[in-house]
Amino acid sequence: LYITWGVFVISTSLSYLYSAQSVILTADQNVYLVKLITGLTRSLAYILQIFLMICGVSFWIVCAIELLSNVIQLILFNRLTLKKYPQLVKLDITDTINKENIISVKSKIKREIKYTFVHKIAGVVVFNTDYLIISVFLGITVITSFSSYMMLIQALGFLISAIASPLGAYIGAKLYSDSKEKVIRIISLYNSLFFMLGVFCAYMFYISSSTFVSLWMGKEIVLSQQLVLLLSVNCFVLIARISFDVAKVGLGYMSDIELPLLEAIINIIVSLVLVHYLGLNGIVIGTIVSNIIVVMILKPVFLYKNALKSDNAFIIHELIRSWFFISIFLLSIFFITRAKVIVSNEWLDFFIQVCMSSITPLLLLIMIYSVFDSNVRKFMFVMFKKMYREN
């Protein structure tokens, strides 16, 4: 037991030794290299660990593979950064920055670390409150059904967040190379794109998640379609908020520490009140209320007003614009398809129906945003122009 624990501690400690290198690569818009190294080494480690466990090898050896994975990552990150940034070896920071600036930078870094810590703690509270309240008031059995759907939402959010992570470095680079107005246009475009992606994923989740869970874990795990609709709203928020989170990282703005705390408080209070009247629906509604108030309204307001110094008229216009397009899509898709839920008893038929059902909402979203949203229209024009030149 102590050997296994010691291996895990050493393995975790090693991961901090190459954090500086990953930060440098990310800041230089080479996050794909970070993802390549970490993704490849972890994937190989997981495959080897699974193989060793199947073979019945001692567990401490399986844990040692994790340690070996971090050692390999440390070596690869060190070699890569030395190759790409050889000037770092000879660079003496005291030659380029005076002591007063060093103290100022250290103070700012410490402050931002504290703010980030508060954000992370509040995020843990928000994302785990539902499970705690469900286990206390509704029982452990309900968690199985709830977590099956949440696993799909979180996996989708994790995948999209991983793809979107380089955008933060891009915004940071543009902040210092271009005007504030151009940075605002870029963030506005990201808002439109992630709102599009969010509402598309939420719609597909609504019509397909219950059948997926039924095929995966059995019909007894399936939740009511009314509850699935509520979870779809949370799915939309989880994806749409990525644009704001990416912008915050790019702008280095973590000062809104009161917002995640407010989100957690609203979520807990509303969920505790509504669980007595609406059961599981009430808990999900509590999360929706906190998401809409804090994540979808207050967070962009704080971002535009404090980080970008935008005026109130622009902020109101940006919020109304985003929700207006979503409303048009929802009304149109309901009128066209009636949001018919996919029903299937076979995996192949299910995936075929998912592919077929995704065509209409995807085309409808592209049409709505290309007609009404100038940012998306210009973006699509540039993409088509690049494709035409390549051909």
Feature map (PLM): residue ranges:
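Membrane-proximal transmembrane or re-entrant/amphipathic helices at the cytosolic face
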Residues: 90-91, 306-311, 334-391
